[in-house]
From Swiss-Prot:
This is Sec-independent protein translocase protein TatA. One of its GO terms (molecular function) is protein transmembrane transporter activity. Belongs to the TatA/E family. Keywords: Cell inner membrane, Cell membrane, Membrane, Protein transport, Translocation, Transmembrane, Transmembrane helix, Transport. Its main location: membrane. One of its GO terms (cellular component) is TAT protein transport complex. The keyword Transport applies. It is found in: Cell inner membrane. Gene3D superfamilies: 1.20.5.3310. It comes from the Bacteria. It is a single-pass membrane protein. It comes from Histophilus somni (strain 2336). InterPro entries: TatA/B/E, TatA/E.
């Protein structure tokens, strides 16, 4: 019950007539830029390997020190 290719073609022609090719091109480039920025932001949120290793080593060292202190007490 979807749209046939003829109906999609007519719909595309109507959209081009209403908005014009220049405005559609601008909308496409704006949408592409937004998607690119979103992907970049998602990748920036992931911790860097070096930072992650450093933090995990600090946590491990602190855990060992705490264990030694508990054993001595």
């Amino acid at each position: 019950m979807g749209l046939s290719w003829q109906q999609l073609l007519i719909l595309l022609l109507v959209v081009v007539v209403i908005f014009g090719t220049k405005k559609l091109r601008n909308i496409g480039s704006d949408l592409g830029g937004a998607v690119k920025d979103f992907k970049k932001a998602m990748n920036d949120d992931q911790p860097k390997d070096a930072e992650f290793k450093k933090i995990s080593e600090e946590v491990e060292q602190t855990s060992v020190e705490n264990s030694k202190q508990k054993e001595q007490a």
